[in-house]
Design a protein with these regions (language model features):
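Alpha/beta enzyme core
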Residues: 3-170
C-alpha cells in the first residue's frame, strides 16, 4: 500500500521510496500481486503502472494526520474513476468507533454496490479509532472489525493485528 503519503505525510518516506516509480519497480521485481495507490498517483503514473502489469488497487478515500479530532475519511475517488484508471479492485477505510462511522459505512455501502455491479472486489480497511476506543488493537476489537467487514460485504478486510492469537480468534 502506498497511500501513506496522504494519510501520514512525508515522515514515512526516504529519498528513494518517495518516488512512485521506485515503488512500481520494487513491486515489479518482487512480483507483487497488486499495488495500492490513491487516485492522483494512479493518474500521474498510469503508463508506468500499465507497463508493469501489476494489478492496480485504488484507495477511494483518505484523510490527513493534521486534524486530531474524531477520524473521518471521505471518498475522494469514484468507482467509475477507478475503473477508468484500470483498477482491478478498490479500497476504503472505515474508522469504527469514530462519531463519524455512520458516514463512512454509508459511503462504503454505495462503493460496494457499485464495485460489485462492475465485478470489482472491495477491500475494507477497518480500524477502531475515536475517543471512546481503548486498546485499539485488542483481540475483541480486531474480531469486531473483521465481523463488520463480513457484514458489510467486503471481499477483503485489512486490520491492524497485534498478535497471531488475536488474528486466529478473529
Amino acid at each position: 500500500a502506498y497511500d501513506q503519503g496522504f494519510e501520514h505525510g512525508p515522515i514515512d518516506f526516504n529519498d528513494k521510496n518517495v518516488d512512485p516509480n521506485y515503488i512500481i519497480d520494487i513491486a515489479k521485481k518482487g512480483k507483487y500481486t497488486a499495488i495500492i495507490f490513491q487516485k492522483g498517483i494512479a493518474e500521474k503514473y498510469n503508463i508506468e503502472i500499465k507497463k508493469s502489469k501489476i494489478p492496480l488497487i485504488i484507495k477511494l478515500n483518505g484523510k490527513t494526520s493534521l486534524h486530531k479530532e474524531e477520524p473521518l475519511s471521505r471518498q475522494l475517488c469514484s468507482v467509475k474513476e477507478a475503473i477508468k484508471l484500470g483498477a482491478k479492485a478498490v479500497g476504503y477505510t472505515i474508522y469504527i468507533g469514530s462519531i463519524h462511522e455512520t458516514i463512512m459505512l454509508k459511503e462504503f455501502e454505495n462503493i460496494q454496490r457499485e464495485a460489485h455491479s462492475n465485478n470489482l472486489p472491495v477491500i475494507a480497511w477497518i480500524y477502531p479509532r475515536g475517543k471512546g476506543i481503548k486498546g485499539k488493537s485488542s483481540g475483541e476489537l480486531l474480531a469486531y472489525a473483521c465481523r463488520i467487514g463480513l457484514e458489510i460485504g467486503a471481499d477483503i478486510v485489512k486490520v491492524h493485528c497485534s498478535d497471531t492469537k488475536d488474528l486466529k480468534w478473529a
